[in-house]
């Protein structure tokens, strides 16, 4: 679709000048489409992508994200579905356990699940009825099994946007927690709906959603600057601690030597264990400066599975 073409972003950006030009063109494309009467019935299927790479530009993305969300709202009003129990006419249920749901595509051995698994487990079942909503395709491993054990209800969502909305609505949640809005299409477009009275997003993908049905962005004092509220369309919640709960990993007894990774043990190794698409153009000069200052230095970056 035209929206898909307008919202494509380069994966690797070569310079700050290029980055500025990319963002200017991106915003121009969205503004032009907002002036037209576009209509789509299922953006998760017809567009099938998010604005994932904006988060790595190191800029304030609020205005862009809000504008993109407005475009989708106008082109597909059904995105603003409201679950029956969230409508003004809904009867308020008697007090009981707080029904809280967590939703993600990455509820397996993935950084999203590894940071959130402990949080799910530590919420007491005396106070909370805990749900996880798994976005297909579902991957099963030890971490996914531990998550299922920690909650009361584990639900595999249908792949259809409309059917997934209905399935979540059936749970009549009090709180719905999105762990990583923006990392894949289904959860991004589900977030436009009102599926719980309180909806919040965790920093699994650390950028504002721009979506007006998202109430809170859960972050930390350690991660946000004094003026960071201006970067979020949601109400920014600064916890006094990081919103993660890591379990200590098991360290293998036998550790590999540098030579087993093809590295020279006589050199000073500077490891940057991040995917290349997360490396900002400003960091190029940082790496170059390290190598200029240390003639025996060697910067090691990580090759990701995807080829670009």
At which residue positions do the language-model features occur?
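Alpha-helical solenoid repeat scaffolds of the TPR/TPR-like class and their adjacent stem/linker regions
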Residues: 1-265, 275, 306
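Nucleotide-sugar-dependent glycosyltransferases with a strong bias toward membrane-associated enzymes
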Residues: 112-113, 280-284
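Substrate-binding clefts and catalytic carboxylate motifs of secreted carbohydrate-active enzymes
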Residues: 271-282
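Short, well-ordered beta-strand segments
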Residues: 99-101, 271, 300
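A conserved nucleotide-sugar
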Residues: 127-129, 288-308
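Short acidic-capped amphipathic helix/loop micro-motif used as an active-site/signal-coupling element
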Residues: 117, 284-288
